[in-house]
From Swiss-Prot:
Protein's name according to its UniProt entry: Heat shock 70 kDa protein 14
UniProt cross-references to PANTHER family, sorted A to Z: HEAT SHOCK PROTEIN 70KDA (PTHR19375)
Assembly and binders: Component of ribosome-associated complex (RAC), a heterodimer composed of Hsp70/DnaK-type chaperone HSPA14 and Hsp40/DnaJ-type chaperone DNAJC2.
Organism lineage: Eukaryota, Metazoa, Chordata, Craniata, Vertebrata
GO molecular function: ATP binding; ATP-dependent protein folding chaperone
Family statement drawn from the similarity comment of this UniProt entry: Belongs to the heat shock protein 70 family.
Keyword Cytoplasm: yes
Amino acid sequence: MAAIGVHLGCTSACVAVYKDGRADVVANDAGDRVTPAIVAYSEREQVVGLAAKQSRIRHVSSTVVKVKQILGRSSADPQAQKYISESKCLVIEKNGKLRYEIDTGEETKLVNPEDVARLIFSKMKETAHSVLGSDANDVVVTVPFDFGEKQKSALGEAAGAAGFNVLRLIHEPSAALLAYGIGQDHPTGKSNVLVFKLGGTSLSLSVMEVNSGMYRVLSTNTSDNIGGAHFTDTLAQYLASEFQRLFKHDVRGNARAMMKLMNSAEVAKHSLSTLGSANCFVDSLYEGQDFDCNVSRARFELLCSPLFNKCTEAIRELLRQTGFTADDINKVVLCGGSSRIPKLQQLIKDLFPAVDLLNSIPPDEVIPIGAAIEAGILVGKESTSGDDSVMIECSAKDILVKGVDESGADRFTVLFPSGTPLPARRQHTLQAPGRVSSVCLELYESEGKNSAKEEAKFAQVVLQDLDKKENGLRDILAVLTMKRDGSLQVTCTDQDTGKCEAITVEVAS
């Protein structure tokens, strides 16, 4: 049976299909295996992908980019605030939710971020259907390890709205390991794997323990100040300085000219991963003046040396955080398009001279391929009633419940620390005054620092219409079960009356 894996990144999206025992990436209608995660709006239509990217220079205020950065977030979220401040497309808050205010020239449209993501997922579904047919809609969708529950939910709902049957959300580093069959080739062995993902806007690092075919995240770290776009911007700034040197005009304050240079720099960056030099030509960059500049790989590496240093220092910091040395790492998996850069690969190899550097699968395809393999496993399980051949067993963040201490201050209790092997079950007794007729159990997630400022509420269970007691306390027993597939089931029971309520929250495994 056929199945689909989709990776929606900040700057691009990619779809792979699992069929006849193997997973392969599918090229879109433009012949490209990776599609820009960009949506352009006009009065009559929405355009997704390369065409939207090409038209952005002319229609920047009606073209949405990097929607993943704002998906499922509120205006109070620092990352959303940063996105809003940098977005060329106006973002407003309406009825407590963020919306794009898009001026098409003929009318103004309010668009939900989830609708933008839905259009990108629809493009991925259309691409997959070109080889599988329209009956194949079972999908596994990848999510970053540091995504909160609201972001995961928004991503899954957008995929569902596009017509996909979402089998599971899977963390990106887990998908990368699946793509290489790590843990399946020697299912009884134990190893530590570094997953290095340099995406369009961030660097994500994870140390994974592989033991008896099962994965566990030991530590993870994401840096938003290093990404493929930062390498592109560095090269574009150099091109702008060269134009100023040659033509005595600084275009760095001209948004349209800089967007042209960014596009040219991006093409050159890709070329320099395989060639010793690249030509950057921009037609009519400023006041009709064409610009032609040749950039060598050596020049590019010199310009980007501060970014390379940030990447290697991030690896060293993650090792310190884990309590590891380089000798404790057995394999390194490269993900994300910018991890193709030869200089970066050499620097990583220098850090781990005795370690296999896995890059035989194109780095921008490895995550969707792993997702497609997981989808194939799940579809096969449904058809054969067999067990999963791969278990992804790890909670991503601390899961906490909120209570109140004797002084009335909020108190958070960690029930599932990040990295908890799954499945897992916990019990928690919540005490409330007997005189109240309703009790609310609030669930939070955090990065593990156990600070109230770090925690984000993602679900709650409310017991209502309880019989009041004249005095004393009421005991509410909460039973939380996190399954192997990542879903969290919560049941709250009033110990006096037996009245109970239950919810299920989907969590990426």
